[in-house]
């Protein structure tokens, strides 16, 4: 990705991706080698050898047949057989819903925040001196939204990857009817490119990549578009014109993840970079200003590397983030406004924990360090969910934080494969997890690559799963009664959320790493030929008709943001686009 043709061949990650793509689409198995090196897909990983799988003898799972019509169970000591379980699931969901309604009638307890004040950890962080003067604490309005657009945030907009805690909100319509490129960024010729080291090699990266979703939000009567890119910068541009609102904020390396905007109206941007730092940036000054940064090596032990791919989740003055250092972090932000009217923070790392355990590392054998957290954490009913590159999906109960109760792990499930897609949660609390298929492990073959889990059944959580040869890097999207999931090889699946049956598929030039976006019954999906497609998914039972396409430059790995008639997305050709009706 972004290197010369002469160095493209022999790239271990590139060859891993090509092999995965070839498994999914043998007829296009050489397609990667024909893509322009400045625009081709890929991320910053060395080659991964398939570990010898370790299976628990009592493990059972459910796999959807290739035609997607039946759910079957497989155990280690018996053949596959059909199983009815959905009536029990629906009954459980109804009981949970009743309890939620009862709790709402009594009154939902809000998180009350208190600073732990652990002075011993101050030396671990970078922080310029606070603004002097008596602070005014920031009010918190971030009641965690359910699946869908109901946010209740003080800041109107699409504020984090997939919009909110359940990672299931995609923006606001209308969807453009006959769109074209309205502007591209940067305005001058050229693109957003920078060098970044991978192992012992330095190469050029261009544009924006996985996940790379921009944030779009209203501030002081103006609509901002904020995104990180492979030029090492965070950009703050005007919705209408594409001109800089603030000068770009430069970090020390490329930015691969999606930025987050403070949901409570504080002028703060939260973002990580490949330069080791997770930052809090103020935007209420003539220039974007770093207020604080957490170093990836500020906690111990760590594994893998120092990047921050996940989009931070901010709720009730706590920031939740997993890092490629393989740790899960919780930071009390202590946001306030100083006497000079400028925003300030006094962050405190109140909790961190390894994202791995001994059972996982034993299962990974020679790949015991391959446990980075590269997805964006999700939240539902007091529990934070995330997965890691070792395939461990886990849930941590954080409901006791205001009372000083340390978070504890309450859910554990092993997919057997790299799991970088963010966990998506529906309004009944079910989890939808996309799993890659790079190593060909026996465990991944058992579990499948698109999995619906019930965390209330921790000993047997699989509701259904779907197998795909290349697996899923993109985060699935919920739409009505289906989950829409783009696979690495270019197949886009629509799967019945209750039964796991495949309703329809689309075949696009892969890899399709862009997470699907669905607003107003319209699916927005980019492909690796640089084409952004729109499909009518108002009838989820039929293959959707295509409504329009827009050609961009380079593979579309980043997830678009839709806000009030305009789409915003970057591509690997080096530019960022505003797309809408003229």
Explain the meaning of each model-derived region.
Residues 1-75:
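N-terminal targeting leaders characterized by basic, low-complexity, disordered sequences
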Residues 99-106, 142:
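Hydrophobic core
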Residues 36, 60, 70, 80, ...:
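Low-complexity intrinsically disordered segments
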Residues 120, 128, 133-139, 143-156, ...:
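Extracytoplasmic/lumenal domain signature
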């Amino acid at each position: 990705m972004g290197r010369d043709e002469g160095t493209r061949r022999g790239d271990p990650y590139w060859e891993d991706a090509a092999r995965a793509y070839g498994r999914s689409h043998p007829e296009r198995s050489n397609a990667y080698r024909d893509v322009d090196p400045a625009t081709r897909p890929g991320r910053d990983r060395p080659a991964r050898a398939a570990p010898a799988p370790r299976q628990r003898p009592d493990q059972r799972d459910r796999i959807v047949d290739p035609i997607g019509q039946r759910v079957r169970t497989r155990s280690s000591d018996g053949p596959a057989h059909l199983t009815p379980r959905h009536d029990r699931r629906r009954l459980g969901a109804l009981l949970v819903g009743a309890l939620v309604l009862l709790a709402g009638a009594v009154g939902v307890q809000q998180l009350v925040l208190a600073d732990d004040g652990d002075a011993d950890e101050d030396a671990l962080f970078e922080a310029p001196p606070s603004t002097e003067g008596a602070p005014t604490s920031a009010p918190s309005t971030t009641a965690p939204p359910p699946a869908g657009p109901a946010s209740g945030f003080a800041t109107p907009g699409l504020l984090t990857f997939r919009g909110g805690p359940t990672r299931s909100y995609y923006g606001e319509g209308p969807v453009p009817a006959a769109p074209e490129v309205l502007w591209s960024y940067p305005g001058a010729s050229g693109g957003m490119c920078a060098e970044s080291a991978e192992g012992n090699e330095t190469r050029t990266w261009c544009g924006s990549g996985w996940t790379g979703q921009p944030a779009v939000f209203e501030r002081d009567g103006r609509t901002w578009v904020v995104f990180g890119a492979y030029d090492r910068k965070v950009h703050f541009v005007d919705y209408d014109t594409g001109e800089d609102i603030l000068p770009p904020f430069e970090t020390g390396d490329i930015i691969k993840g999606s930025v987050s905007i403070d949901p409570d109206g504080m002028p703060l941007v939260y973002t990580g970079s490949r330069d080791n730092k997770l930052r809090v940036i103020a935007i209420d000054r003539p220039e974007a200003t770093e207020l604080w940064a957490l170093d990836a090596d500020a906690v111990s032990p760590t594994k893998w590397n120092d990047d921050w791919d996940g989009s931070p989740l901010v709720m009730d003055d706590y920031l939740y983030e997993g890092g490629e250092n393989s740790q899960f972090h919780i930071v009390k932000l202590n946001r306030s406004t100083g006497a000079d009217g400028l925003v300030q923070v006094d962050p405190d790392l109140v909790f961190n924990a390894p994202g791995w355990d001994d059972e996982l590392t034993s299962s990974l054998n020679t790949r015991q360090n391959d446990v980075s957290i590269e997805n964006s954490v999700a939240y539902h009913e007091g529990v934070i969910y995330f997965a890691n590159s070792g395939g461990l999906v886990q849930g941590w109960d954080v409901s006791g934080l205001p009372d000083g109760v340390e978070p504890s792990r309450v859910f554990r499930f092993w997919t057997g494969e790299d799991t970088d897609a963010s966990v998506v949660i529906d309004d009944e609390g079910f989890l939808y997890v996309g799993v890659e298929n790079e190593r060909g492990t026996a465990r991944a073959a058992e579990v499948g690559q698109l999995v619906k889990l019930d965390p209330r059944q921790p000993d047997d959580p699989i509701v259904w799963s779907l197998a795909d040869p290349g697996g899923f890097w993109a985060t699935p999207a919920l739409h009505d009664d289906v989950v829409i999931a783009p696979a690495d090889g270019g197949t886009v699946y629509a799967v019945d959320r209750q039964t796991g049956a495949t309703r329809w598929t689309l075949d696009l030039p892969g890899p399709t790493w862009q997470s699907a976006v669905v607003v107003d019954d319209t699916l927005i999906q980019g492909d690796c030929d640089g084409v952004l497609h729109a499909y009518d998914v108002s009838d989820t039972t039929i293959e959707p008709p295509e409504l329009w396409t827009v050609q961009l430059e380079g593979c579309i790995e980043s997830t678009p943001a839709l806000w009030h008639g305009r789409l915003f997305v970057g591509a690997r050709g080096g530019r960022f686009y505003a797309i809408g009706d003229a």
